[in-house]
Amino acid sequence: CSDLAYSLLLSREYPGWLYEVEHGATTIWERWNGIHPDGALADPEMNSFNHYANGAILEWMYRHMAGLQPIAAAPGFQQIRYAPQPDGRLQFCKSQLLTPFGLYMSEWEITADALCFSLRIPCSCTAELVLPDAPPVIHINGAAHPYTPGMTLPSGTYRIIYAPTRCYYVRYDLETPAQVVFSNEKLLALLLQIVPQTASVPPVLSATAHESIRALLDASGISLNDAQRKELESAWAAIHQWDL
């Protein structure tokens, strides 16, 4: 669910939250495609351009991206569940939440070999830790601590670092989904430069293909020689995921 939510958040095509932003939105639309790509308006009978309702995303961003989740038994955020869900498509997240008990601050950052979290818990409050892909031992404020999901931290400021059990640092190679390659100018430019025959792939197919770029090229009858394969993977490996 988190992967799909991030896709909706970051996509500039419909259905995607940034589709509205790309078309000039400064408030939430009733329809996420209230303006068509050609500039035409959707059905005026249901086409408010200031319609903050179920299409809003900030609650999801605070609860799941930042990880600040209230607990019903402790109203007012006196106790929270800290369960952030980083995604490799974003390098970092910073958030603040002012509650009746004080200010919470949550930050995370993805590096090549670690997940790094910063959490500020206000006075008289506590947080249950539910960390993503955490190993049995994590580092809290520079010291090693055994990690158990649901362990509680009292009020204070914490820096949590660990090497996750799965990789969050995105690397591009021939197993990258074709849709990702064709939707990024840098990846596509290198592909066309090194494998010019890729230009013959039908635009509709390239834009919707969820299989790997290797599978798409094979299905299109395009074969890479060893030199092309090595040059392409070397060029893609040099691209930082957040530069795209």
Role assignments for model-derived ranges:
Residues 3-169:
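Non-catalytic C-terminal accessory modules of carbohydrate-active enzymes
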Residues 11-16, 197-198, 239:
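A short structural micro-motif
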Residues 170-231, 236, 242-243:
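Compact, charge-rich alpha-helical regulatory domains located at protein termini
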